[in-house]
């Protein structure tokens, strides 16, 4: 968890208001349970995280079989989600984390049903966001000379790997995209 900047705190607060209002509209929980989400602190993940888009952190010693909103220490979102181009996906990620904060610990069928109640398109952008993060932080691109597929990576391939699509040996190319 990283402490958000002033701008990030403002963006997180606006995001929280939007998501809580939408959760009231779709009737996820009763109003008092939703209001219990309001005091949960929002923070940001480290900028170099590539796999995790958000996380709900529970306090140590919380009873895992009976999680309550009071047991939530913080909800962290990836700082790049606060960029306006990812706003729709950021709302979905915060909604997802709030479902955890309401006591839905596992990604089981019941959790997925609640997740599907989200009325906006952002939910489909998860894979795209992961690829964006990997591309941003990659030092090397493993490039297929045959089909031009690119695999962003931290290390060189040195001819040890083949393309998933056509089995051609991958070539190392320095990633020229700027990391923010």
Residue ranges and their predicted role:
Residues 97:
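Walker B catalytic acidic pair
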Residues 1-92, 101-180:
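Active-site-proximal or metal-binding-adjacent scaffold patches in catalytic folds
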